Amino acid sequence: MTIAKLIDHTALKPDTSKAAIMQLLEEAKTHQFASVCVNPTWVSLAAKELAGTGVDVCTVIGFPLGANTTAVKAFETKDAIENGATEVDMVINIAALKDGEYDAVEQDIRAVVDAAKGKALVKVIIEACLLTDEEKVKACELSVKAGADFVKTSTGFSRGGATAEDIALMRKTVGPDIGVKASGGVRTKEDVEAMLAAGATRIGASAGVSIIKGDQSAPSKDY
């Protein structure tokens, strides 16, 4: 499998233009990335442009704070799938996790999993930079219990991104059968290789083209 097939080619900044999205989609088709990850407003366009190309359409739910109500996250998921999304990256209720409200966190994840059941993969963003190691483990355990397909390090919009240490901890926690996605600050082929070595099975990056070309001058940005 090529590195490209492990990358979610990503554009999530709020000022991303239609022209930039069209460029992202063309790059995804050319390089055959695993998916494009775009904000919900672009899902319909992405699904139309990528139909039959083998590139999946990923979007984000409760993004980037995770502070939406569970009902809203479930609705967002259903709406995204109706518009053509085949993968959804949801943000957990971070405050509830830190307050020890584990049932609420699990129910929040499960609502998205249920809304996506059989129609889209669910990746759970734990926003690792805001959590203690114990909280990271708990977030991963709750994600597995709720039926998620992946756990994911970061939104790329908080104070830190993916680290090899977090990936290793997440992989150890979820075991071999759940995906682990590294996102936030992954900008070079060497970054990707370090994440894969630590246990990642998917990479979220806006610098996907630079990564696969081995360009060391990739722009210093996350999403």
Curated annotation (Swiss-Prot):
What EC number(s) are associated with this protein in UniProt? 4.1.2.4
Q: Which HAMAP family match?
A: DeoC_type1 (MF_00114)
**Reaction(s) the record says it catalyses:** 2-deoxy-D-ribose 5-phosphate = D-glyceraldehyde 3-phosphate + acetaldehyde
The record's similarity note reads: Belongs to the DeoC/FbaB aldolase family. DeoC type 1 subfamily.
Molecular function (GO) terms listed? Answer: deoxyribose-phosphate aldolase activity
Q: List the disulfide bonds.
A: none
Q: What is this protein called?
A: Deoxyribose-phosphate aldolase
Q: What keywords would UniProt list here? A: Cytoplasm, Lyase, Schiff base
Indicate the enzyme's highest-level EC class: lyase
UniProt gene name: deoC
The record's listing under Pfam families reads: DeoC
Q: Which organism is it from?
A: Bacillus pumilus (strain SAFR-032)
Q: Which GO terms describe its cellular component?
A: cytoplasm
Q: Which domain of life is it from?
A: Bacteria
What does this chain do? Catalyzes a reversible aldol reaction between acetaldehyde and D-glyceraldehyde 3-phosphate to generate 2-deoxy-D-ribose 5-phosphate.
Q: Please give the InterPro entries that the UniProt record associates with this protein.
A: Aldolase_TIM (IPR013785), DeoC (IPR011343), DeoC/FbaB/LacD_aldolase (IPR002915), DeoC_typeI (IPR028581)
What's any GO biological process attached to this entry?
Answer: 2-deoxyribose 1-phosphate catabolic process
Question: Chief location of this protein?
Answer: cytoplasm
Q: Where is the active site?
A: D89 (proton donor/acceptor), K152 (schiff-base intermediate with acetaldehyde), K181 (proton donor/acceptor)
Subcellular location(s) per record: Cytoplasm
Q: Give the record's pathway.
A: Carbohydrate degradation; 2-deoxy-D-ribose 1-phosphate degradation; D-glyceraldehyde 3-phosphate and acetaldehyde from 2-deoxy-alpha-D-ribose 1-phosphate: step 2/2
